[in-house]
């Protein structure tokens, strides 16, 4: 995991230090050394990079023309919209992310497999922007709605249907 040994607070003969200041990689003492800071930043990133997350799973039509992508509390509405689209004769699938950092290892492979990918977010598109930074050559459509309310399935179906027609 890359985690260092921690003395359990109260263990006799051990000193326990907590706080937000940068520590020396060698001693654990507070350090303002730029090289140490660089090394500790790389160490923290390696811990994140080594987290094992499951592969991304796609639900819906395996031969979909449109992949709908979401995360968080949008799952039910997006799945309902994808199911309705498939029932209406469209070919749609859903990839709902549970892990964003690190991303599932198969993220780029999944997103690049589909003719069209739409990222549905209840914000201004931070996830789509993140993927554009992380995945070279990715082409994404966006559905962004910031109303403080859940997505309306009918709105999603209408938007996704028009997107397939383009």
Question: Each predicted region: which residue ranges?
Answer:
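Flexible, low-complexity linker and terminal segments
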Residues: 1-166
